[in-house]
Amino acid sequence: MRLPLILALSLAIVPLGRALAQAPPTPALPAGTATPPMAPAAPLAGTGDFHIVWEVKDRFRLFRNDADFLRLAAASRGDGVLAAEDRLERATDGLGWAKDVVANLCLDNFGNLEETCERDGVRENYLTPIDHPIGVTISGPAPQDASCVWSFDSGNGPSQQTTVPCDQEVKLRVPSGRTTVASVDIPLGDGTAQRVSTEIAVRDVLVAGLGDSIAAGEGNPDKAVELDGGFCFKRFLSGGFSQYFRPSRAGYDDDRSCENGPSSPTAARDWDRHGARWMNPACHRSLYSYQVRTMLALAIEQPHLAVTLVPLACTGATIGAGMFAGQRADDCPWVVGIETCSGTAPAQFTELRDVMAAVHRQDPKRNLDMVLLTIGANDVNFAGLVANVIVDATTERILLKQGGAIASVDDATKSLEGDLPDEFSQLRTALKPFVGGNLDRVVFVSYPNPAMQAQDKPCPGGRDGLDVHPAFGADAERLRAAAQFVETKFLPGIRALATCEGNKACRNPTTDGMTFVDGHQAEFVQHGMCVRASSDPEFDRNCFLTNGNSFQTDPNAAPDNPMACGEPPSDYKPYAPRARWIRTANDSYFTAMTYPEGMPAILKPSDIHDALWGVLSAVYGGAVHPTAEGYAAMADAAVPAVRGVLGLQAPPAVQA
């Protein structure tokens, strides 16, 4: 592991306006949007209206480029993550902002953290930076055309001095874990000068993100799949097979028909190349996740903070297979020169131990400040509950039952009340060493109920939003029972386990209880997967029909355009604002089109034309997960809890 060789302050004087003007172009945001201003520091000396203002640059350290951070900060007006997400979605015409950022993260080609990362031209140790970039300026009516004399003393050598125009920002790097005193002599109109000083101390918080698909951001690839004309699927039935067409991945040039037998390995690789892109493909980690959005929001609102996020959450994780042991990979990334992947993802606790070992090799005193966590749904086989509700056809239900992919409410209840308490006990024991023995530094963000359209009113069932596969159709009674289980048993049960309510398998409730977040659940009640509004995207209103007849059945017309409405599939806007905050099966296919990897042999599709993968793609690949707006609402609920754990104050605009 290589460390940056910057052992002293390095000065770069850049006018603030010019520095921002050099950022890459970005889609225009609504009028009135502005980057949050730098926060003033309380002066140590001096009088009058002058004070020193400073901020950490590129303070969300997962980003390589400060320009990316500034673009996202510009969408924030202090009114929450959801409001900012709405502005970003409109500014990008519903195509998403993360597609322009995902290639510029401190991650390798497989989505794993790089210990050494080049950020804005400087190689840094991602986990243990020795210094931080900051910008310093003067707030107050400085004389025009005057020059100010700055000095910076970090206590490890001679102070650094520079003379610049008073209206210019001074950019420099200050040592980590050390206070730097900044002073400036400001000329006054009477020929004298006023000295103003302040202390600069960057706080760098180290946060791990753990858990399952809800923690990872499933359903929302950083770059959504691009769509075009029809692609043939062959559905095997008891008496033979049938064919139907759905949108293809744009750019896929191999055979789209079902007439020429199984697809070749070359065709499969070409199919992979044109899939969605994820921050981490094996685990479907996404920049849209509530964990990323929470810590990004904190970095935006706290100018003196640097945020070092370690994202480890993984779709499909259970406490046993995912946290303590490895699990199947959700996807296999296509990387030039690598033709195969292992089909597995490592245990999150193993990864976290490796991360902290790397941290302590460089800085034995640096520890985790906090853990973000969501886990437990897969332990009660929530995906099996989803399959039980939406898979209506006999052939597919039999196959999924044989593969263990169907679960009833009774099955889920037995797991919730039987095995899960002991598993949570093991989870608490494993987490404690990472957070100093007290689990109040673990922020557990709970699940939303995905199947509600209003208070005490579950979605009605049917094929609305589910007709991407002929086998889908939500059974109304099974849906009602599942929604009731989530509302009355699962969510209260998870809360009790996380917080030690009723001493649920907690040896010491004072140290075993986690900080719990569920404020978003009330908001999701009116934004379930069946909710529609006149403000929904035009494609949704015209082409996703409530009667379940969204797709072309004419075998002559479907290869060119599989949509019954006649509009091209490419008009679908994966990240446009919607009334529903839960992805439907249609949304999942049109946004991610996940080809599932690591499945049991009985459930493994024969090739890319096998309609079985369409079932698995919905059940395991994003359906019944929050949209980007839903994850943003979860982040809004989490931010106050995170501030409390880290001992941070809300900015004045939020307090007001």
PLM region spans:
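Bacterial N-terminal signal peptides
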Residues: 4-15
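Beta-strand-enriched, solvent-exposed domains that form extended recognition/catalytic surfaces
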Residues: 29-206
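Low-complexity, serine/threonine/proline-enriched polar segments
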Residues: 73-102, 233-301, 375, 404-407, ...
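Structural recognition of the beta-strand scaffold that forms the well-ordered cores
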Residues: 206-210, 214-218, 308-313, 369-374, ...
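Short, solvent-exposed loop/turn and secondary-structure capping segments
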Residues: 217-226, 321-325, 382-387, 454-457
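Conserved SGNH/GDSL esterase-like catalytic core that processes O-acyl groups on lipids
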Residues: 230-415
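A structural motif corresponding to the C-terminal end of an alpha-helix
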Residues: 290-308, 364, 416-442, 478-520
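Mobile gating loops/cap/lid regions near enzyme active sites that modulate substrate access
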Residues: 449-499, 503-624
